[in-house]
Curated annotation (Swiss-Prot):
It comes from the Eukaryota. The keyword Cytoplasm applies. This is Profilin-2. GO terms for molecular function: actin monomer binding. Occurs in many kinds of cells as a complex with monomeric actin in a 1:1 ratio. It is found in: Cytoplasm, Cytoskeleton. It comes from Parietaria judaica (Pellitory-of-the-wall). Belongs to the profilin family. It holds the Pfam family Profilin.
Length: 131
């Protein structure tokens, strides 16, 4: 399966009631884009560095916030292997795997829990596959 198929079929899927993520991507730890949805924001190198720093030392982004394509999200949870950000009625979930970062961005009516489930389910699958 291509990386784009993972984004299209597993991240941008309907989670019920017609709700889908606003955008999604799978990127390498170096920030290279493996696959993304059409409207996923272009990440800046310093944003990827901040994300990787938070995965390596939890809480790194808490004082400054999580930035994705210049948009700031308040970090509400940083747990082992995942970063969750909130912005207004939307937010983002990031899941680190051995080689990649799975990113989902949502807006209402999708809920934070639905976004977390979609992103973490694919992230956990990739971890199980050694990716």
């Amino acid at each position: 399966m291509s990386w784009q198929a993972y984004v299209d079929d597993h991240l941008m899927c309907d989670v019920g009631d017609g709700n889908t993520l606003a955008s999604a991507a799978i990127i390498g730890h170096d920030g290279s884009v493996w696959a993304q949805s059409a409207n996923f924001p272009q990440l800046k190198p310093e944003e990827v560095t901040g994300i990787m720093n938070d995965f390596n030392e939890g809480g790194f982004l808490a004082p400054t916030g999580l930035f994705l394509g210049g948009t700031k999200y308040m970090v509400i949870q940083g747990e082992s292997g995942a970063v969750i950000g909130k912005k207004g009625s939307g937010g983002a979930t990031l899941k680190k795997t051995g080689q990649a970062i799975v990113i989902g961005i949502y807006d209402e009516p999708m809920t934070p829990g639905q976004c977390n489930l979609v992103v973490e389910r694919l992230g956990d699958y990739l971890l199980e596959q050694g990716m």
